Amino acid sequence: DVCDSLVEGRCIHNGCWCDEEAPHGNCCDTAGCTAWWWCPGTKWD
């Protein structure tokens, strides 16, 4: 798959990821910007 970005060596396929410790308040997009909403469908390789 073509990855939008990498976080800790893992691919982001939907353009954002969430910290498992704070899934509703600590999301980031591929630009590294903090987003204050849940990112549904986050998929890691």
Curated annotation (Swiss-Prot):
Gene Ontology cellular component annotations, sorted alphabetically: extracellular region
List of residues that carry 6'-bromotryptophan: W17, W37, W38, W44
Keyword vocabulary terms for this entry: Bromination, Disulfide bond, Gamma-carboxyglutamic acid, Hydroxylation, Ion channel impairing toxin, Neurotoxin, Secreted, Toxin
Cysteines engaged in disulfide bonds, as pairs: C3-C16, C11-C28, C18-C33, C27-C39
Predominant location: secreted
Residue numbers bearing the 4-hydroxyproline modification: P23, P40
Domain of life: Eukaryota
Keyword Magnesium tagged: no
Tissue specificity annotation: Expressed by the venom duct.
Cellular localisation: Secreted
UniProt GO MF annotations: ion channel regulator activity; toxin activity
Residue positions, PTM 4-carboxyglutamate: E21
Free-text comment on this protein's domains from its UniProt entry: The cysteine framework is XII (C-C-C-C-CC-C-C).
Role of this protein: Mu-conotoxins block voltage-gated sodium channels. This toxin reversibly blocks voltage-gated sodium channel in cephalopods, with no alteration in the voltage dependence of sodium conductance or on the kinetics of inactivation.
Protein name, UniProt field: Mu-conotoxin-like Cal 12.1.1d
